[in-house]
Regions:
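Ser/Thr-rich, Pro/Gly/Ala-heavy low-complexity intrinsically disordered linkers and tails
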Residues: 1-54
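Structured C-terminal helix/loop/strand segments within mature extracytoplasmic catalytic/sensor domains
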Residues: 52-124, 287, 300-440
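Active-site-adjacent helix/loop patches that line small-molecule binding or acyl-intermediate pockets
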Residues: 96-129, 137, 198-312, 316
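Short, conserved catalytic-motif segment at the N-terminal edge
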Residues: 134-165, 181
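Extracytoplasmic
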Residues: 135-139, 161-163, 167-172, 290, ...
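Active-site SXXK
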Residues: 165-191, 406
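Short glycine/serine- and small hydrophobic-enriched flexible loop segments
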Residues: 178-186, 225, 297-304, 433
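Short, well-structured active-site flanking segments
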Residues: 182-208
């Protein structure tokens, strides 16, 4: 299951504020019952009344050991879930909105420091607070999200590498599919999108196959190229720049993934009979060369399409994004959990205790992600998680929910690729544990 081939002008960079939680701050990994990171001046409970969640479980800084019989044995424990540990939420709803609430953009962290979250449109400042948490040579951007009065507010973190571009490998295949959806919508006067079928195949099932690498019946790499043929490579590159993300010219997107496109065809039909036929783009596009900031920002904007109207990918509809996130609706092949929920990588999940996350959210959590693996052992992942806290009446408890995006690339480190996979999982655990307990 290996992978194949912000704001306009780029973010400013800020140092860690006084009192920022470091490796030895109170409530570290392995410490239970520490502060939650509530809003300044708010009592715990908020919208959920006086409800206070259970204390945090002790989280070992080391991810789980390798199981006795990994399958396939020559793949990777966390990138490929060779121990079969992947979990899905018990609450099914394709129209899910993260039930996380905060009363103020001023957030008090576990160490008592107060940090400000900003709404979309505010100048982006990236705080370099991750340097001591991640391996040397790792590229990483984290976007923390707080919903204040239903409006998302953001705080960006990195280790100073957020603007450094690299080959993002297979993490970009979902962006190729998103671009394809956009082109189909515009070409069909918005009547055809990723909800359609081509050549007898539901596009949503093909998106799932991109993410879970089941080769049934096409390869993930070939499907990545197919979606570039549909969306167009020049347009894919434009999305990185003036058309959508406003990133620098040094970042480019439009390269293929090392396999030929399958013979699916380019005539698309919706269940209601709407059709469109397009001419495929078979040109060679610019190489894929993106930063972790760009990868994280793109996924953030896709997931928050409904909330952030000014940051929407042009042309795409929410039903297309539902297809990216969950796969085809009512899929007889994959069931309710397709699309990016089927990514084989479990870096977000091993970042904390999945039983605790399931219980405190009453099953109403989500993780959408996409892995990448380079030919020289570059381990990558980009993903979004919503981990709310609900009270006994399933109402959100203000100040306790967590919502975040992480884009990471670990190109070096460890004596083997398997050890590098573990190093990346350990870095995710260090970051996510601190997100959950309120130190970040």
């Amino acid at each position: 299951s290996t992978g194949g081939g912000g704001a306009a002008g780029g973010p400013a960079t800020g140092g860690a504020p006084a009192g920022a939680g470091g490796a030895d701050a109170p409530g570290g990994a392995g410490t239970a019952g520490t502060g939650q990171g509530a809003q300044a001046g708010d009592a715990p409970g908020g919208q959920g009344g006086g409800f206070v969640p259970e204390p945090f479980p002790e989280i070992d800084p080391e991810p789980p050991p390798l199981c006795a019989n990994p399958e396939p044995p020559d793949y990777f424990q966390f990138l490929d879930d060779t121990c079969g540990d992947k979990r899905f939420p018990t609450y099914e709803d394709r129209d899910f909105t993260c039930p996380s609430v905060d009363a103020s953009p001023m957030i008090t962290r576990a160490d008592g420091s107060v940090v400000l979250y900003e709404p979309a449109g505010a100048p982006v400042v990236v705080h370099e607070e991750l340097t001591d948490l991640v391996p040397a040579g790792m590229f990483v951007t984290v976007i923390l999200i707080r919903r204040v009065g239903g409006v998302p507010h953001y705080r960006y973190l990195s280790n100073g590498t957020h603007d450094t571009a690299y080959q993002p490998w297979s993490t970009t295949k979902v962006l190729a599919a998103a671009n394809a959806a956009s082109r189909l919508r515009i070409a069909s006067d918005y009547s055809v999108g990723l909800t359609a079928s081509a050549g007898g195949y539901r596009l949503g099932d093909l998106v799932t196959s991109i993410c879970n690498y089941d080769y049934d019946p096409f390869s993930s790499n070939g499907l990545g190229r197919y979606f570039h043929d549909v969306g167009g490579r020049a347009r894919a590159n434009d999305l990185i720049h003036d058309l959508w993300l406003g990133r620098p010219a040094s970042e480019t997107f439009g390269g293929n993934y090392g396999a030929a496109a399958p013979s699916i065809g380019y005539s698309f039909v919706e269940d209601d009979g709407a059709t469109v036929t397009i001419s495929p783009d078979t040109t060679s596009g610019p190489a894929n060369n993106l930063s972790s900031f760009t990868a994280a920002e793109a996924i953030k904007r896709l997931v928050l399409h409904r909330e952030e109207a000014t940051q929407r990918l042009p042309g795409i509809q929410w039903s297309d994004i539902e297809t990216l996130l969950y796969g085809a609706a009512d899929s007889t092949k994959y069931g309710p959990w397709g699309g990016m929920t089927r990514d084989t990588a479990i870096y977000h999940q091993v970042g904390h205790d999945p039983d605790y996350i399931e219980a405190r959210s009453k099953g109403q959590w989500r993780t959408f992600s996409k892995l990448g693996l380079g030919t020289s052992g570059q381990f990558l992942d980009v993903g979004y998680s919503c981990w709310p806290v609900l009270d006994d009446e399933e109402q959100p408890v203000a100040g306790y929910g967590r919502e975040f995006v992480i884009a990471a690339n670990l190109p070096t480190g460890g004596a083997s690729w398997a050890e590098r996979d573990r190093l990346l999982a350990r870095a995710y655990r260090a970051i996510i544990t601190r997100i959950v307990d309120g130190r970040l």
